[in-house]
Protein backbone atom coordinates (compact mmCIF):
# COMPACT_ATOMS: atom_id res chain seq x y z
CA UNK A 1 0.00 0.00 0.00
CA UNK A 2 1.32 3.40 -0.94
CA UNK A 3 3.90 1.89 -3.30
CA UNK A 4 1.73 1.85 -6.42
CA UNK A 5 1.84 5.11 -8.40
CA UNK A 6 -1.42 6.91 -8.96
CA UNK A 7 -2.61 7.91 -12.42
CA UNK A 8 -1.67 11.47 -11.60
CA UNK A 9 1.88 10.36 -10.73
CA UNK A 10 2.12 8.35 -13.94
CA UNK A 11 0.94 11.35 -15.95
CA UNK A 12 3.52 13.60 -14.29
CA UNK A 13 6.33 11.13 -15.01
CA UNK A 14 5.29 10.51 -18.61
CA UNK A 15 4.68 14.17 -19.35
CA UNK A 16 8.11 15.27 -18.09
CA UNK A 17 10.05 13.96 -21.14
CA UNK A 18 7.51 15.59 -23.44
CA UNK A 19 7.87 18.87 -21.53
CA UNK A 20 11.64 18.72 -21.96
CA UNK A 21 11.37 17.65 -25.58
CA UNK A 22 9.27 20.65 -26.53
CA UNK A 23 12.19 22.92 -25.66
CA UNK A 24 14.37 20.91 -28.02
CA UNK A 25 11.70 21.37 -30.70
CA UNK A 26 11.68 25.11 -30.01
CA UNK A 27 15.47 25.31 -30.31
CA UNK A 28 15.36 23.57 -33.70
CA UNK A 29 12.53 25.89 -34.76
CA UNK A 30 14.52 29.00 -33.79
CA UNK A 31 17.64 27.64 -35.49
CA UNK A 32 15.61 26.97 -38.64
CA UNK A 33 14.53 30.60 -38.70
CA UNK A 34 18.17 31.64 -38.26
CA UNK A 35 19.91 29.40 -40.79
CA UNK A 36 17.27 28.48 -43.36
CA UNK A 37 15.38 31.77 -43.71
CA UNK A 38 16.95 34.83 -42.10
CA UNK A 39 20.66 34.60 -42.97
CA UNK A 40 20.07 33.53 -46.61
CA UNK A 41 17.55 36.37 -46.99
CA UNK A 42 19.27 39.23 -45.18
CA UNK A 43 22.65 38.59 -46.79
CA UNK A 44 21.37 40.06 -50.07
CA UNK A 45 21.09 43.77 -49.11
CA UNK A 46 24.71 43.91 -47.95
CA UNK A 47 25.88 41.88 -50.96
CA UNK A 48 23.91 43.99 -53.46
CA UNK A 49 26.82 46.37 -54.11
CA UNK A 50 29.02 43.42 -55.10
CA UNK A 51 26.21 41.70 -57.01
CA UNK A 52 25.23 44.89 -58.86
CA UNK A 53 28.81 45.47 -59.94
CA UNK A 54 29.19 41.90 -61.13
CA UNK A 55 25.85 41.74 -62.99
CA UNK A 56 25.63 45.45 -63.97
CA UNK A 57 22.33 46.16 -62.17
CA UNK A 58 20.74 49.59 -61.56
CA UNK A 59 19.21 50.79 -58.27
CA UNK A 60 15.66 50.12 -59.52
CA UNK A 61 16.68 46.64 -60.68
CA UNK A 62 18.15 45.95 -57.26
CA UNK A 63 14.85 47.03 -55.69
CA UNK A 64 13.01 44.73 -58.10
CA UNK A 65 15.20 41.76 -57.16
CA UNK A 66 14.77 42.50 -53.44
CA UNK A 67 11.01 42.78 -53.80
CA UNK A 68 10.39 39.98 -56.29
CA UNK A 69 11.46 37.36 -53.77
CA UNK A 70 8.20 38.10 -51.99
CA UNK A 71 6.10 37.36 -55.10
CA UNK A 72 5.69 33.63 -54.46
CA UNK A 73 4.86 34.33 -50.83
CA UNK A 74 1.55 35.80 -51.97
CA UNK A 75 0.55 32.31 -53.13
CA UNK A 76 2.74 29.80 -51.35
CA UNK A 77 2.06 31.40 -47.99
CA UNK A 78 -1.46 30.02 -48.17
CA UNK A 79 -0.41 26.76 -49.82
CA UNK A 80 2.33 26.20 -47.26
CA UNK A 81 -0.13 26.75 -44.44
CA UNK A 82 -2.61 24.27 -45.91
CA UNK A 83 0.17 21.70 -46.40
CA UNK A 84 1.31 22.14 -42.81
CA UNK A 85 -2.25 21.74 -41.51
CA UNK A 86 -2.75 18.53 -43.50
CA UNK A 87 0.64 16.80 -43.63
CA UNK A 88 1.98 18.05 -40.32
CA UNK A 89 4.75 20.51 -39.60
CA UNK A 90 7.41 17.83 -39.13
CA UNK A 91 7.30 16.58 -42.72
CA UNK A 92 6.56 20.00 -44.17
CA UNK A 93 9.54 21.67 -42.51
CA UNK A 94 11.90 18.80 -43.36
CA UNK A 95 11.05 19.10 -47.05
CA UNK A 96 11.00 22.92 -47.00
CA UNK A 97 14.50 23.20 -45.47
CA UNK A 98 15.94 20.80 -48.03
CA UNK A 99 14.35 22.49 -51.04
CA UNK A 100 14.78 26.09 -49.84
CA UNK A 101 18.46 25.44 -49.14
CA UNK A 102 18.98 24.10 -52.65
CA UNK A 103 17.14 27.06 -54.17
CA UNK A 104 19.13 29.52 -52.06
CA UNK A 105 22.37 28.01 -53.31
CA UNK A 106 21.15 28.29 -56.91
CA UNK A 107 21.11 32.09 -56.55
CA UNK A 108 24.90 31.91 -56.61
CA UNK A 109 24.84 30.60 -60.18
CA UNK A 110 23.08 33.72 -61.54
CA UNK A 111 24.68 35.48 -64.50
CA UNK A 112 22.25 38.33 -65.18
CA UNK A 113 19.09 40.04 -63.93
CA UNK A 114 16.77 37.35 -65.31
CA UNK A 115 18.56 34.39 -63.75
CA UNK A 116 19.04 36.21 -60.45
CA UNK A 117 15.37 37.17 -60.35
CA UNK A 118 14.31 33.62 -61.22
CA UNK A 119 16.41 31.98 -58.52
CA UNK A 120 15.38 34.60 -55.95
CA UNK A 121 11.73 33.84 -56.75
CA UNK A 122 12.37 30.10 -56.41
CA UNK A 123 14.04 30.62 -53.03
CA UNK A 124 11.16 32.80 -51.88
CA UNK A 125 8.68 30.19 -53.11
CA UNK A 126 10.12 27.57 -50.77
CA UNK A 127 11.45 29.63 -47.86
CA UNK A 128 8.08 31.34 -47.35
CA UNK A 129 6.63 27.98 -46.29
CA UNK A 130 8.92 27.80 -43.26
CA UNK A 131 7.89 30.62 -40.84
CA UNK A 132 4.17 29.82 -40.76
CA UNK A 133 4.89 26.16 -40.00
CA UNK A 134 7.47 27.08 -37.37
CA UNK A 135 4.84 29.17 -35.58
CA UNK A 136 2.24 26.44 -36.04
CA UNK A 137 4.75 24.10 -34.39
CA UNK A 138 4.85 26.47 -31.42
CA UNK A 139 1.05 26.38 -31.30
CA UNK A 140 0.95 22.58 -31.17
CA UNK A 141 3.76 22.03 -28.66
CA UNK A 142 3.07 24.90 -26.23
CA UNK A 143 0.06 25.90 -24.16
CA UNK A 144 -1.57 29.31 -24.42
CA UNK A 145 0.25 30.36 -21.24
CA UNK A 146 3.64 29.73 -22.89
CA UNK A 147 2.74 30.51 -26.50
CA UNK A 148 3.84 34.14 -26.44
CA UNK A 149 7.23 33.14 -25.04
CA UNK A 150 7.62 30.30 -27.57
CA UNK A 151 6.83 32.55 -30.51
CA UNK A 152 9.20 35.13 -29.04
CA UNK A 153 12.06 32.61 -29.01
CA UNK A 154 11.25 31.62 -32.61
CA UNK A 155 11.21 35.30 -33.59
CA UNK A 156 14.52 35.85 -31.80
CA UNK A 157 15.98 33.09 -33.97
CA UNK A 158 14.86 35.02 -37.03
CA UNK A 159 16.33 38.23 -35.63
CA UNK A 160 19.63 36.51 -34.87
CA UNK A 161 19.83 35.38 -38.48
CA UNK A 162 18.99 38.84 -39.77
CA UNK A 163 21.74 40.29 -37.56
CA UNK A 164 24.39 37.77 -38.58
CA UNK A 165 23.42 37.86 -42.24
CA UNK A 166 23.75 41.63 -42.44
CA UNK A 167 26.84 41.82 -40.23
CA UNK A 168 29.16 39.16 -41.66
CA UNK A 169 28.04 38.33 -45.22
CA UNK A 170 29.78 41.19 -47.05
CA UNK A 171 32.56 42.16 -44.66
CA UNK A 172 33.65 38.68 -43.50
CA UNK A 173 32.12 35.79 -45.45
CA UNK A 174 32.52 37.18 -48.98
CA UNK A 175 36.26 38.00 -48.68
CA UNK A 176 36.89 34.73 -46.84
CA UNK A 177 35.00 32.50 -49.29
CA UNK A 178 35.99 34.35 -52.44
CA UNK A 179 32.88 36.30 -53.42
CA UNK A 180 29.11 36.56 -53.08
CA UNK A 181 28.43 33.38 -55.06
CA UNK A 182 30.29 31.16 -52.60
CA UNK A 183 28.53 32.85 -49.69
CA UNK A 184 25.17 31.80 -51.14
CA UNK A 185 26.44 28.25 -51.75
CA UNK A 186 27.51 27.85 -48.11
CA UNK A 187 24.27 29.31 -46.74
CA UNK A 188 22.25 27.00 -48.98
CA UNK A 189 24.11 23.88 -47.83
CA UNK A 190 23.61 24.87 -44.18
CA UNK A 191 19.86 25.24 -44.67
CA UNK A 192 19.68 21.85 -46.38
CA UNK A 193 21.34 20.20 -43.36
CA UNK A 194 18.46 21.35 -41.14
CA UNK A 195 16.15 18.98 -42.98
CA UNK A 196 17.56 16.08 -40.95
CA UNK A 197 16.54 17.11 -37.39
CA UNK A 198 13.01 17.81 -38.61
CA UNK A 199 12.87 14.43 -40.34
CA UNK A 200 14.00 12.65 -37.15
CA UNK A 201 11.78 14.68 -34.82
CA UNK A 202 8.91 13.10 -32.89
CA UNK A 203 5.43 13.82 -34.26
CA UNK A 204 3.77 16.79 -32.61
CA UNK A 205 1.27 16.04 -29.83
CA UNK A 206 -2.37 16.94 -30.14
CA UNK A 207 -3.69 20.36 -29.23
CA UNK A 208 -1.37 21.72 -26.56
CA UNK A 209 -4.22 23.40 -24.74
CA UNK A 210 -5.19 26.36 -26.90
CA UNK A 211 -8.93 26.93 -26.93
CA UNK A 212 -10.79 27.42 -30.17
CA UNK A 213 -10.31 25.54 -33.38
CA UNK A 214 -9.83 22.23 -31.61
CA UNK A 215 -11.50 20.29 -34.38
CA UNK A 216 -9.41 18.94 -37.23
CA UNK A 217 -9.75 20.88 -40.45
CA UNK A 218 -12.26 19.47 -42.90
CA UNK A 219 -11.99 19.37 -46.68
CA UNK A 220 -9.81 22.04 -48.26
CA UNK A 221 -12.69 24.09 -49.60
CA UNK A 222 -14.40 23.98 -46.22
CA UNK A 223 -11.19 25.01 -44.46
CA UNK A 224 -10.63 27.98 -46.76
CA UNK A 225 -14.27 29.03 -46.42
CA UNK A 226 -13.96 28.87 -42.65
CA UNK A 227 -10.81 31.03 -42.59
CA UNK A 228 -12.26 33.48 -45.13
CA UNK A 229 -15.29 33.95 -42.89
CA UNK A 230 -13.18 35.29 -40.01
CA UNK A 231 -13.23 39.05 -40.62
CA UNK A 232 -10.37 39.73 -38.24
CA UNK A 233 -7.96 37.64 -40.34
CA UNK A 234 -8.54 39.95 -43.32
CA UNK A 235 -7.89 43.04 -41.19
CA UNK A 236 -4.71 41.51 -39.81
CA UNK A 237 -3.68 40.71 -43.39
CA UNK A 238 -4.23 44.35 -44.36
CA UNK A 239 -2.15 45.44 -41.37
CA UNK A 240 0.79 43.16 -42.12
CA UNK A 241 0.78 44.19 -45.80
CA UNK A 242 1.56 47.77 -44.82
CA UNK A 243 3.94 47.13 -41.95
CA UNK A 244 5.89 44.30 -43.55
CA UNK A 245 6.16 46.22 -46.82
CA UNK A 246 7.53 49.21 -44.90
CA UNK A 247 10.20 47.13 -43.17
CA UNK A 248 11.13 45.16 -46.29
CA UNK A 249 11.60 48.28 -48.38
CA UNK A 250 13.55 50.10 -45.68
CA UNK A 251 15.96 47.26 -44.98
CA UNK A 252 16.77 46.69 -48.63
CA UNK A 253 17.39 50.39 -49.29
CA UNK A 254 19.16 51.41 -46.06
CA UNK A 255 22.74 50.21 -46.87
CA UNK A 256 22.54 51.64 -50.40
CA UNK A 257 21.13 54.94 -49.09
CA UNK A 258 23.85 55.34 -46.47
CA UNK A 259 26.59 54.53 -48.96
CA UNK A 260 25.04 57.04 -51.34
CA UNK A 261 25.21 59.86 -48.79
CA UNK A 262 28.86 59.15 -48.08
CA UNK A 263 28.92 56.53 -45.33
CA UNK A 264 31.74 53.94 -45.52
CA UNK A 265 30.55 50.49 -46.55
CA UNK A 266 31.30 48.94 -43.17
CA UNK A 267 29.31 51.64 -41.35
CA UNK A 268 26.36 51.27 -43.72
CA UNK A 269 26.30 47.51 -43.13
CA UNK A 270 26.64 48.11 -39.38
CA UNK A 271 23.50 50.26 -39.41
CA UNK A 272 21.52 47.38 -40.90
CA UNK A 273 23.10 44.96 -38.43
CA UNK A 274 22.17 47.33 -35.59
CA UNK A 275 18.53 47.30 -36.71
CA UNK A 276 18.52 43.51 -36.55
CA UNK A 277 20.51 43.27 -33.32
CA UNK A 278 18.16 45.63 -31.49
CA UNK A 279 15.21 43.65 -32.84
CA UNK A 280 16.74 40.39 -31.60
CA UNK A 281 17.43 41.83 -28.14
CA UNK A 282 13.84 42.91 -27.59
CA UNK A 283 11.98 40.04 -29.31
CA UNK A 284 11.36 37.98 -26.16
CA UNK A 285 10.79 40.95 -23.78
CA UNK A 286 8.18 42.35 -26.14
CA UNK A 287 6.43 38.97 -26.43
CA UNK A 288 6.40 38.60 -22.64
CA UNK A 289 5.11 42.16 -22.29
CA UNK A 290 2.15 41.30 -24.50
CA UNK A 291 1.42 38.27 -22.27
CA UNK A 292 1.33 40.50 -19.19
CA UNK A 293 -0.48 43.35 -20.89
CA UNK A 294 -3.41 41.10 -21.77
CA UNK A 295 -4.00 42.86 -25.09
CA UNK A 296 -2.03 41.69 -28.11
CA UNK A 297 -3.64 44.38 -30.27
CA UNK A 298 -2.42 47.19 -28.02
CA UNK A 299 1.12 45.81 -28.14
CA UNK A 300 0.94 45.51 -31.94
CA UNK A 301 -0.29 49.09 -32.33
CA UNK A 302 2.51 50.37 -30.10
CA UNK A 303 5.02 48.46 -32.21
CA UNK A 304 3.57 49.84 -35.44
CA UNK A 305 3.86 53.40 -34.11
CA UNK A 306 7.55 52.85 -33.37
CA UNK A 307 8.18 51.50 -36.87
CA UNK A 308 6.43 54.54 -38.36
CA UNK A 309 8.46 56.90 -36.18
CA UNK A 310 11.82 55.27 -36.88
CA UNK A 311 11.37 54.89 -40.64
CA UNK A 312 9.95 58.39 -40.92
CA UNK A 313 12.97 59.81 -39.10
CA UNK A 314 15.33 58.10 -41.54
CA UNK A 315 14.01 60.39 -44.28
CA UNK A 316 15.49 63.45 -42.55
CA UNK A 317 18.06 62.06 -40.11
CA UNK A 318 21.79 62.51 -40.51
CA UNK A 319 24.84 61.52 -38.50
CA UNK A 320 24.07 60.14 -35.05
CA UNK A 321 20.31 60.54 -35.57
CA UNK A 322 20.45 57.73 -38.14
CA UNK A 323 21.41 55.34 -35.35
CA UNK A 324 18.55 56.64 -33.19
CA UNK A 325 16.05 56.15 -36.02
CA UNK A 326 17.38 52.66 -36.76
CA UNK A 327 17.10 51.76 -33.08
CA UNK A 328 13.51 53.00 -32.79
CA UNK A 329 12.34 51.10 -35.87
CA UNK A 330 14.35 47.98 -35.09
CA UNK A 331 13.28 47.74 -31.47
CA UNK A 332 9.99 46.03 -32.27
CA UNK A 333 10.33 44.22 -35.62
CA UNK A 334 10.73 40.61 -34.47
CA UNK A 335 8.77 41.07 -31.26
CA UNK A 336 5.96 42.46 -33.39
CA UNK A 337 5.99 39.35 -35.59
CA UNK A 338 5.96 37.03 -32.57
CA UNK A 339 2.92 38.80 -31.14
CA UNK A 340 1.28 38.93 -34.57
CA UNK A 341 1.59 35.15 -35.04
CA UNK A 342 0.28 34.54 -31.53
CA UNK A 343 -2.65 36.86 -32.25
CA UNK A 344 -3.63 34.84 -35.31
CA UNK A 345 -3.52 31.53 -33.42
CA UNK A 346 -5.56 32.99 -30.54
CA UNK A 347 -8.22 34.50 -32.81
CA UNK A 348 -11.68 33.06 -32.21
CA UNK A 349 -12.37 30.27 -34.69
CA UNK A 350 -8.71 29.65 -35.59
CA UNK A 351 -6.67 27.84 -32.92
CA UNK A 352 -3.82 25.44 -33.76
CA UNK A 353 -5.98 23.35 -36.12
CA UNK A 354 -6.43 26.20 -38.60
CA UNK A 355 -3.27 28.11 -37.65
CA UNK A 356 -1.22 27.11 -40.68
CA UNK A 357 -3.86 28.16 -43.19
CA UNK A 358 -4.71 31.38 -41.34
CA UNK A 359 -1.06 32.38 -40.97
CA UNK A 360 -0.53 31.47 -44.61
CA UNK A 361 -3.34 33.77 -45.71
CA UNK A 362 -1.99 36.73 -43.76
CA UNK A 363 1.55 35.99 -44.96
CA UNK A 364 0.19 36.19 -48.49
CA UNK A 365 -0.69 39.82 -47.72
CA UNK A 366 2.78 40.26 -46.24
CA UNK A 367 4.30 38.87 -49.43
CA UNK A 368 2.28 41.31 -51.51
CA UNK A 369 3.55 44.22 -49.43
CA UNK A 370 7.12 42.94 -49.65
CA UNK A 371 6.77 42.63 -53.42
CA UNK A 372 5.48 46.11 -54.23
CA UNK A 373 7.14 48.23 -51.54
CA UNK A 374 10.86 48.00 -52.49
CA UNK A 375 10.67 48.86 -56.21
CA UNK A 376 8.02 51.55 -55.67
CA UNK A 377 10.02 53.16 -52.88
CA UNK A 378 13.34 52.89 -54.71
CA UNK A 379 11.82 54.53 -57.79
CA UNK A 380 11.17 57.66 -55.68
CA UNK A 381 14.85 58.07 -54.80
CA UNK A 382 15.31 60.27 -57.87
CA UNK A 383 13.13 62.95 -56.21
CA UNK A 384 15.29 62.96 -53.08
CA UNK A 385 17.27 60.19 -51.36
CA UNK A 386 15.06 60.30 -48.24
CA UNK A 387 11.67 60.20 -50.02
CA UNK A 388 11.47 56.37 -50.15
CA UNK A 389 11.39 56.28 -46.34
CA UNK A 390 8.41 58.67 -46.34
CA UNK A 391 6.56 56.33 -48.71
CA UNK A 392 7.32 53.28 -46.58
CA UNK A 393 6.29 55.04 -43.37
CA UNK A 394 2.98 55.82 -45.09
CA UNK A 395 2.50 52.11 -45.78
CA UNK A 396 3.00 51.41 -42.08
CA UNK A 397 0.34 54.01 -41.22
CA UNK A 398 -2.04 52.05 -43.43
CA UNK A 399 -1.10 48.93 -41.44
CA UNK A 400 -1.74 50.72 -38.17
CA UNK A 401 -5.26 51.49 -39.35
CA UNK A 402 -5.82 47.78 -40.01
CA UNK A 403 -4.72 46.95 -36.46
CA UNK A 404 -7.05 49.60 -35.05
CA UNK A 405 -10.00 48.03 -36.86
CA UNK A 406 -9.04 44.46 -35.83
CA UNK A 407 -10.75 44.48 -32.45
CA UNK A 408 -9.74 41.99 -29.78
CA UNK A 409 -11.16 38.53 -30.49
CA UNK A 410 -11.00 36.02 -27.67
CA UNK A 411 -12.27 32.45 -27.88
What do these predicted regions represent?
Residues 199-222:
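Flexible cytoplasmic inter-helical loops of multi-pass small-molecule transporters
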Residues 351-383:
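A late C-terminal transmembrane helix in Major Facilitator Superfamily
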Residues 75-113:
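Conserved MFS/SLC helix-loop-helix module at the cytosolic interface between two early adjacent transmembrane helices
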Residues 119-158:
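Cytoplasmic helix-loop-helix junction between adjacent transmembrane helices
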Residues 154-203:
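Helix-loop-helix hairpin linking two adjacent transmembrane segments in secondary transporters
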Residues 44-45, 231-273, 278-283:
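Extracytoplasmic gate region of multi-pass secondary transporters
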Residues 129-142, 335-349:
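Intracellular juxtamembrane helix-capping segments at the cytosolic ends
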Residues 86-96, 291-304:
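Cytoplasmic membrane-interface "Motif A"-like loop-to-helix N-cap segments
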